[in-house]
A protein has these predicted regions:
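RNase H-like, Mg2+-dependent phosphodiesterase core
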Residues: 1-160
Length: 160
């Protein structure tokens, strides 16, 4: 998952990737991805070198709830605002995401935003044809277990 940070005034953009391991069993179930997303948000804001009274707008997505609570504790309620990300920040984050998945060898369907189901099955078929890439798939969602491809995937247990 790509997390982006954008400063409108200067058009600065930074991003980082939330490791897929947080979206697999057992980490997914314990929601470790929330803490990691929060850490990435703080790292990105540090790289942007926030001004003393600069407002911070954060995507309304659930994954940022923990980050927002920590930001409010650190900067105060008045500086933090939840928003629907659109425009240039959305475009740049989407480009970063596309670059990351293309680096894995996957070419997404062109109309992926309009046809989410088609996009999902396109990616699932790509994984079926490239099983070595399953290590990059977010397999923690219980509903994915209805698909044979994900039922048969058992990640190696590692200590991290």
């Amino acid at each position: 998952m790509v997390i982006g940070a954008f400063r409108c005034e200067t058009q600065q953009f930074r991003y980082d990737v939330l490791d897929v391991k947080y979206f697999r069993h057992p980490r997914f179930r314990s929601k470790e991805y929330l803490k990691q997303a929060s850490e990435i948000v703080f790292q990105l804001l540090s790289k942007l070198e926030l001004g003393k009274d600069e407002r911070i707008q954060v995507c309304r997505g659930y994954i940022f709830d923990e980050a927002v609570e920590s930001l409010k504790e650190m900067y105060g309620d008045d500086r933090i605002e939840r928003i629907a990300v659109t425009g240039e920040p959305q475009r740049l984050t989407e480009i970063a995401y596309m670059d990351e998945i293309r680096n894995l060898g996957y070419e997404p369907v062109k109309e992926r935003d309009e046809k989410k189901a088609k996009s999902f099955f396109h990616m699932m078929n790509w994984l079926r044809n490239n099983p070595e890439k399953l290590i990059y798939a977010k397999t923690g969602w219980p509903r994915l277990q209805r698909y044979h491809l994900f039922r048969s995937y058992r990640p190696r247990q590692t200590r991290e």
